From Swiss-Prot:
Cofactor note: Binds 1 [Ni-Fe-S] cluster.
Name of the molecule in the record: Acetyl-CoA decarbonylase/synthase complex subunit beta
Regions of compositional bias (Low complexity) in chain numbering: 453-466
MF term (GO), any: iron ion binding
Length: 524
């Protein structure tokens, strides 16, 4: 177990400290501000996000090691930051109390997203190592001068909303070197440890799953179902975390969900989950399959760590994580696909997941799992490499192998990926796709048979090729019907030969229709 202890502050960095509760704040604090978006033009500064390192972390410590309502700020404060720029950002909370235990750390940590969005002019997105904060210009105009004020407001909300927290202390860091050091040496090992706990447990081993509705302020119809084999989309809540949260706050955002009857063991559909999803989504959804990509997929909020996207050109699924900025082979970036995927929608063809879901033995098992996966960024693939079966690992392309659909198709042919000849899903040995080769062979055989049948009377003297007539279009014009159109004789195919045009797109910019003039007497 990773040791929980207070961080050491290096020499030579700027430090501010403040102890005790704040008398008043220069901003409103209310749930009405949840879901507030701060656009780039309205932003004073950005903290963390796509261009700067950042993380949030909660650690449970003994009572005597936590100084209640103390804030330590390491690095430049708001009044030293340049408007319009982005800065590193880490938020560490030490918590203590009789009921506080290590199992509650991720649950309390996830509520940081909840509480900080109560603050007017402060936007908090994502979680763990993906946090993305924006502070609005209006908040600065109203008197927000220091991140210490944000920390004090957040700690006050923690103690008011979660009274089992008897002591809380915050350390906020904007010094880039220290943020990166603590992210790699402290936060990531703790996150990894939390995720690994649930690997030995399976959906069949428990009687209930847990919900998470924290993101409904941004995605009102999203209902996250957390099972042993499927962690939350944000990656911050596992089944153990949901259980711990429901124990201390049974009416909170993490509630027990009875599994009910197992309706589809491969797709992961349960009657209890369906009933809960229907209720919590306001009737927007009636069915959810936890381990299916195409049929009644899980809804996606906007905090997902990874987006799965279907590419019909190769009949395969790609995955892209939040940290990959380049376009995927389908030509879309993560941020563009996020707009299609998020918002609490059930979208066939796009799916948001947490990185820990790649560990699952049931990873999109209804649709072939890893054997349907054809592309991932190298960074993501390396991160989850040990969970990819040996016989498919080298057949999954990265940006070094393919950046376009044409390049991806060639790569998949070269390595003989299962999608080329047809995917057999491991869970039940069923072949679920035909593959390209089989489809191409069937089409070739069909064309050959038809050509042979039409060539049979070719022993007779060949007739001159006749113009190919197209039937009248089912379109009525005032007073007359569109006449039949004729192709020029030069375009006609020779007798006994069938012309097959595949994958063609025909664009007609203009159709001009004229009445035929009657022949003048005398043949003129």
């Amino acid at each position: 177990m990773v040791e929980r202890k207070r961080i050491e502050i290096p020499e030579g960095v700027k430090v501010k400290e403040s102890v005790g509760e704040e008398a008043e704040f220069p901003f409103d604090i209310s749930p009405m501000y949840e879901g507030e978006r701060i656009r780039k033009g309205d932003m004073y500064v950005e903290l963390g996000g796509p261009t700067q390192p950042g993380f949030e972390l909660v650690m449970a410590l003994p009572m005597d090691q936590v100084e209640d309502m103390k804030v330590t700020l390491i690095g430049p404060d708001l009044d030293e930051m340049e408007e319009g720029q982005a800065y590193p950002y880490a938020m560490i909370y030490y918590i203590a109390g009789e009921m506080v235990e290590t199992d509650l750390e991720p649950v309390i940590e996830r509520r940081n997203h909840d509480f900080q969005n109560y603050i007017e002019g402060y936007m908090h997105l994502n979680q763990r190592y993906d946090i993305w904060i924006r502070i609005g210009k209006n908040a600065i105009k109203k008197g927000l001068k220091s991140l210490i004020q944000i920390a004090k407001a957040t700690m006050m909300l923690y103690k008011n909303e979660l009274p089992f927290i008897e002591k809380i202390e915050a350390v906020y860091i904007t010094d880039k070197d220290l943020v990166e050091k603590l992210l790699n040496e402290l936060a990531m090992p703790i996150f990894e440890e939390r995720d690994a706990r649930v690997e030995a447990l399976s959906d069949e081993d428990v009687d209930e799953f847990y919900s998470c509705t924290l993101c409904q302020s941004f995605a009102p119809t999203n209902v996250c179902i957390v099972s042993p084999d499927r962690p939350s989309l944000c990656g911050a809540i596992t089944w153990f975390d949901g259980r711990a949260a429901a124990k201390v706050d049974p009416e909170g955002p993490n509630r027990a969900v009875p599994k009910g009857e197992l309706l589809d063991p491969i797709g992961g559909e349960y009657s209890g989950v369906n009933e809960f999803a229907k209720q919590e989504s306001g009737g927007e959804y009636e069915r959810i399959k936890l381990h299916s990509f195409f049929e009644y997929p899980h809804t996606s909020c906007g905090c997902f760590e990874v987006i799965g996207f279907y590419m019909p050109e190769v009949d395969g699924i790609g995955w892209v994580h939040r940290g990959y900025a380049e376009p995927a082979p389908n030509g879309l970036t993560f941020s563009t696909m996020a707009g299609q995927t998020g918002g609490g929608k059930q979208v066939v063809g796009f799916l948001g997941i947490g990185i820990a879901y790649f560990r699952s033995k049931k990873f999109i098992q209804a649709d072939g799992g890893w054997y349907r996966t054809v592309w991932m960024p190298k960074e993501l693939k390396e991160r989850v490499a040990k969970y990819i079966p040996d016989d498919i690992r080298d057949k999954i392309a990265t940006e070094e192998d393919a950046k376009t659909l044409d390049e991806l198709r060639e790569f998949l042919k070269k390595v003989d990926h299962p999608v080329v000849k047809g995917v057999v899903r491991p869970v039940d040995g069923k072949k679920i796709t035909n593959g390209w080769v089989e489809e191409e062979e069937e089409e070739a055989e069909e064309v050959a048979e038809e050509a042979a049948a039409e060539a049979a009377p070719a022993a007779q003297p060949a007739q001159a090729a006749q113009p190919m007539a197209m039937q009248p279009m089912p379109m009525q014009m005032p007073g007359f019907q569109l006449p039949a159109l004729q192709m020029p004789a030069a375009s006609a195919a020779p007798a006994g030969v069938k012309l097959v045009i595949k994958d063609a797109k025909i664009t007609i910019e203009k159709v001009i229709i004229k009445k035929a003039e009657k022949e003048k007497k005398g043949g003129k």
